[in-house]
Amino acid sequence: MSESDLWLLPDGVEELLPPEATRIEELRRQLLDLYHSWGYEMIVPPLLEFLDSLLIGVGRDLELEMFKVTDQLTGRLMGIRADMTPQVARIDSRRSHDVASRFCYIGSVLRTKSPSMFSSRTPIQTGCELYGVVGSAADIEIISLMLETLNLAKISPLHMDIAHVGVYQAILAEAKLSKIQSEELFEALRRKAIPEVDEIAATIPDKAIRQKVMALPRLAGGKEKMKEARKIFAGNPDIEYALDEMSQVAAVIGERYPEVEIYFDFCEMRGYKYYTGLVFAAYTEGLGQAVAKGGRYDEVGRDFGRGRPAMGFSVDLKALYRMGKREWAQPAGAILAPNGQDAELWELIRQLRRSNRVIQLMPGEEAGHWASHCDRQIVRDESGQWIVKPLTEFNPNHVK
């Protein structure tokens, strides 16, 4: 391996350097403060667990994205987390009470492949999850908190897609397609490939059901599309219930956040195997994928012995920072301190570090390198006392 190869990082793997790392950390702290103000408790799941635990519920769709290692102590397979939701489900299942549980988390996850060419395989996943609450109130709270997260990062303009897996499930039950046809329809709808959807629909004998299937990729849009959907799907109570949920959530979110454009999408197939109700995703200009997404996944903790209603969202902290339009303030200048073991100098440095950055030179270190980082310096005055002076009066002979 050449020396240059030693410096290379794998594709999709990156490191954070100043000042980006400092700003991302500041954003992380502000997000935790936001979640705390909403009553969400922070949890820190482990980076790796036994594979079986990570593949529970939501995790099974993530198996191909998960790095696997062998535990040298037990010989069992372990996985490095690719998503934190299965871990949160395990944590919630260990709680004995039946009241609502609100969790938030921020931590690195690792994926074998990136969802897109420009996305990271090592995102810093940030999210909130609400357990134990049935109904639209939980959906509205989680979506509101997601939008507050994006607002804090100054991401705009925003538009949000709202979907409901109950619509597709109900139509699939009516159509009575074979397993192969169902899989083909799923893929065609996911890609919004209208000709392929029409071709599959043509095999359905019942005209009314055939028209419902054909309508799915043509119903993406605003309020007018919801009105059209109600006419097309009238008479199916499961679909009508799903449409009511979508409309109720959209109405409240639209009133709270009028600047966010809301669309209904009946072809949103993301997470179809584990989502059980409303699903949503937020988008912004310049990013070809959702900047934040989530949905309802009731009973996700059933395999842990305690299935409960669950709703949540997640976002990549690094994407939040990079897509945001925040104007970051320049850090305050540091104080340059000379090298030395003088007791009075050390006491002054300790006091100053309670509210300032103080950089003390090492033996033989040149002061000039740090001059651009500092706006003040510690020097001795004429009486021999250590004092702080503006760096405009910088004299390298005073700080050695």
Swiss-Prot record:
Disulfide bonds: none annotated. Keywords: Amino-acid biosynthesis, Cytoplasm, Histidine biosynthesis. Pathway: Amino-acid biosynthesis; L-histidine biosynthesis; L-histidine from 5-phospho-alpha-D-ribose 1-diphosphate: step 1/9. GO terms for biological process: histidyl-tRNA aminoacylation; L-histidine biosynthetic process. It comes from the Bacteria. It is found in: Cytoplasm. It holds the Pfam family tRNA-synt_His. Heteromultimer composed of HisG and HisZ subunits. Required for the first step of histidine biosynthesis. May allow the feedback regulation of ATP phosphoribosyltransferase activity by histidine. This is ATP phosphoribosyltransferase regulatory subunit. It comes from Hahella chejuensis (strain KCTC 2396). The lineage of its organism: Bacteria, Pseudomonadati, Pseudomonadota, Gammaproteobacteria, Oceanospirillales.
